[in-house]
Amino acid sequence: MKVRASVKKLCRNCKIVRRNGVVRVICVEPRHKQRQG
């Protein structure tokens, strides 16, 4: 899980999801998981 000021899609499988006011990236590639912090 990467914590970043700006989350970006890293590949075509990445999806940007908003959960409880937190922006996250979910992907089939575990290294692409990100959270805005």
From Swiss-Prot:
It comes from the Bacteria. GO terms for biological process: translation. The keyword Signal does not apply. GO terms for molecular function: structural constituent of ribosome. Keywords: Ribonucleoprotein, Ribosomal protein. GO terms for cellular component: cytoplasm; ribonucleoprotein complex; ribosome. InterPro entries: Ribosomal_bL36, Ribosomal_bL36_sp. Belongs to the bacterial ribosomal protein bL36 family. This is Large ribosomal subunit protein bL36. It comes from Acidithiobacillus ferrooxidans (strain ATCC 23270 / DSM 14882 / CIP 104768 / NCIMB 8455) (Ferrobacillus ferrooxidans (strain ATCC 23270)). The lineage of its organism: Bacteria, Pseudomonadati, Pseudomonadota, Acidithiobacillia, Acidithiobacillales.
